[in-house]
Amino acid sequence: SIMGMGRGAGNLNTELFVEYLNETAGADYSTEPILCSIDNTIAPIYMTTAWGYSLSGYLSAKYRCHQNYARFLNNKNTLTFEGMNAIFSKIEPEKRDNYDREYIDKLYTAHMSAGGEKTPEADLSRLFEGRNVVIIAPGRTTSVESERQKVFDKVKATDAIVISVNHCPEWIKCDYVFVSNIRRYEKLSGIETDKLIITSNINAQAGYTVGYEPLLCSIEAVRDNVTLMLIALLIRSGASSVYLAGVDGYSFKERNFAYRDMETYEDEQVAKEQNSGISAAIAQLSQRIPVSFITKSLLEREENRS
């Protein structure tokens, strides 16, 4: 079956048989439709009921690379099959057998940094300079009515601009939507182009396109966390203060998102590293701009309560 879907360890994999026949029996099967089906349909099911191995593991085997390369890219949760395949194809033969974290991170960053023309920073400063900003992340707390009311109250009290990240909530009107994840972007619909702010790794029409690499965090585990990237952009654009909603932190036992189709399998160690990384990054960013939480969060520190 495709992706070996089945109970426990799953079944033998269609895509592996196809690749084997192409290499050894002179067959000319196209694997791309199968892999796209995995990416778009079967992989989301796998995230809630895991079995067998992963798509990234298949690519690691295909390119005969150390499995930790696959794990590194998979844990990013930002790449489509096409993007991951493109990165694997650039791994040099002499680098494939032994895992080099710094090397794969450079390939990943180079892939994500590629893009077209960027919006002048002056244009963004005109939007945000001197303004309070409420950031709406897709954390599970934003599905709770009492938590939503806190957000409404904060927006009204501070006359804040509202920016959602990697999603477009229906329960509140957002002035802008900031997207850094191509997988999330592909699931969005009905957003006015002039309200869309994207990072340069996304090749799409938008009101504003900002450089990906300049917004990266210095903490490895959360280098390209979307909320941290947006805060960095707001600092560069002269915003006055930032309030966070739906930035809940990560749990490896419970749901993390307001939307089930956003759920990913969270390894306990990865979740801990992300939580500590985001907390540390917010503490650093708070030295340059006031940052506080509106909704409940595992990341919340006493001094950052709103």
Model-derived features: where do they sit?
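Metal-ion/cofactor- or nucleotide/acyl-coenzyme-handling active-site neighborhoods
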Residues: 115-306
